């Protein structure tokens, strides 16, 4: 049997961490077993579904490297097939037309309150559909749920799950306007797409029981189900619309790498010999749903930052520059010259060692690709204003250095000598020198930075800083 998994998001909102992890686990499971990973857009909620959101989900998955196989299945385009299955179930006597109004159903529910029993709608039309004496008014189609039995399935994570049939309502599979419900569409699509394994959040367990009942009514074999524990926030609370994790596109905008985010999501529930850093190629080889635990995972921003720093450090300088350049050009509002790129490439290694995200790196490296006028942060401005006398003296000292001697070793010696003769702490000199040349109080080794920028640029920036 060839493994076929699927990711089936509802295009009513952007791809979030929980959905991305579900997609990742399904993708890894399929790739590990050399199977297929399919993508289906469950857009039956037409009022809230959006083509823009569909494209954003596709873009986010592509950015994460989760490429799907075959064409994307759009659920709403298969409505005729869903309706045909509902009609077949009615003809088989396994579903029926329910003419009860919404008010009548609500009245039944109201009367059952306080009994302590699960509310199960009792439709008077359940056994009358074959008489031919049916009212001429709107109806829904309900599936006849089994009675006096227990529905069981073996979940790949939680083990045996059992639900008594009296806890399952005669679920609506066709609405009064003739459109299929989510539960019907999902079961039909999973069957027709030949899905063999479904990996999704544990909040779907109730739906799974109903879907198994529906599949059995059609004499279909259900896929193997794996329900993974939900993701909670840093404090262990459930994520909600108000208390949600950022969408995948937000993590991208914050400067996180897709490799880091995938590694982060992988470790939310799955583990192998306590390995923290697992590349996607490694994950494909190692991935097994047997290694997924039953405990909920909590967001851990520090871990994500740690992973991102690792993956940034593992990239070549040219790869980092390719990622960094669009961010810098957007910040500066134009193309960056070859001369400035050359400066940046000489200093990028030291910058990467310090940066946590690409956005951090872009901010930290601006001084390499700017001209004399640079962005100077408030702390650096204050440092410059408090050190103008010494800055002027240091400027005079730096101006007297022969261009051939503008090397980091000689510059370090000059700075050391300057601090000694002025009875200044080296750290203080580095502070106001760094502030005037980079616009920041933190940077890589300032002597190395000065060598890369060149004497003329450094002198001009120090002159400009005196005007603050």
Curated annotation (Swiss-Prot):
Q: Write out the residue ranges of the motif 'HIGH' region.
A: 9-19
Q: Name one GO cellular component term.
A: cytosol
Q: Which GO terms describe its biological process?
A: glutamyl-tRNA aminoacylation
Q: What is its EC number?
A: 6.1.1.17
Enzyme category, top tier? ligase
Which keywords does this Swiss-Prot/TrEMBL entry list? Aminoacyl-tRNA synthetase, ATP-binding, Cytoplasm, Ligase, Nucleotide-binding, Protein biosynthesis
Q: Which residues bind ATP?
A: 241
Report the sequence similarity comment from the record: Belongs to the class-I aminoacyl-tRNA synthetase family. Glutamate--tRNA ligase type 1 subfamily.
> What is the designated name of this protein?
Glutamate--tRNA ligase 2
What is the species listed in this Swiss-Prot or TrEMBL entry? Anaplasma phagocytophilum (strain HZ)
């Amino acid at each position: 049997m060839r493994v076929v998994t699927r990711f089936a998001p509802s295009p009513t909102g952007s791809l979030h961490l929980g959905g991305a992890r579900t997609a990742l686990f399904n993708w890894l499971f399929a790739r590990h077993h050399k199977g297929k990973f399919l993508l289906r857009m469950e857009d039956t909620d037409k009022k809230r579904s959006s083509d823009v959101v569909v494209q954003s989900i596709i873009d986010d998955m592509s950015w994460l490297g989760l490429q799907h196989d075959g064409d994307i299945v759009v659920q709403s385009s298969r409505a005729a097939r869903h309706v045909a299955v509902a009609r077949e179930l009615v003809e088989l006597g396994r579903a029926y037309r329910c003419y009860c109004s919404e008010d009548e159903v609500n009245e039944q529910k109201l009367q059952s309150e306080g009994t302590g029993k699960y509310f199960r709608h009792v439709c008077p039309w359940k056994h009358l559909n074959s008489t031919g004496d049916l009212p001429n008014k709107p109806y829904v189609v309900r599936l006849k749920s089994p009675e006096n039995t227990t529905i069981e399935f073996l979940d790949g994570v939680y083990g045996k799950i059992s639900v008594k049939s009296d806890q399952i309502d005669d679920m609506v599979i066709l609405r009064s306007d003739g459109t299929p419900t989510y539960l019907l569409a999902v079961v039909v699509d999973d069957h027709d797409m030949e899905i063999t394994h479904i990996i999704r959040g544990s909040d779907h367990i109730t739906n799974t029981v109903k879907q198994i009942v529906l599949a059995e009514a059609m004499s279909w074999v259900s896929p193997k189900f794996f329900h993974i524990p939900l993701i909670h926030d840093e404090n262990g609370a459930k994520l909600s619309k108000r208390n949600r994790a950022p969408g995948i596109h937000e993590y991208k905008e914050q400067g996180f790498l897709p490799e880091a985010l995938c590694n982060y999501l992988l470790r939310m529930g799955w583990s192998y010999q306590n390995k923290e850093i697992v590349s996607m190629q490694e994950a494909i080889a190692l991935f097994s749903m047997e290694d997924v635990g039953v405990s909920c995972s909590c967001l851990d921003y520090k871990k994500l930052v740690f992973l991102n720093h690792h993956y940034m450090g593992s990239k070549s300088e040219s790869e980092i520059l390719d990622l960094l350049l669009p961010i810098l050009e957007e910040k500066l509002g134009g193309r960056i010259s070859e001369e400035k790129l050359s400066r940046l490439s000489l200093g990028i290694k030291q910058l990467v060692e310090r940066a946590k995200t690409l956005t951090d790196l872009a901010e930290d490296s601006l001084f390499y690709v700017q001209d004399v006028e640079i962005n100077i942060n408030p702390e650096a401005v204050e440092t410059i204003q408090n050190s103008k006398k010494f800055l002027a003296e240091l400027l005079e000292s730096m101006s007297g250095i022969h261009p051939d001697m503008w090397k980091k070793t000689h510059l370090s010696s000059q700075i050391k000598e300057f601090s000694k003769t002025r009875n200044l702490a080296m750290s203080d000199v580095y502070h106001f020198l760094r502030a005037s040349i980079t616009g920041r109080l933190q940077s890589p080794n300032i002597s190395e930075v000065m060598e890369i920028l060149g004497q003329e640029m450094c002198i001009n920036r120090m002159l400009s800083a005196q005007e603050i």
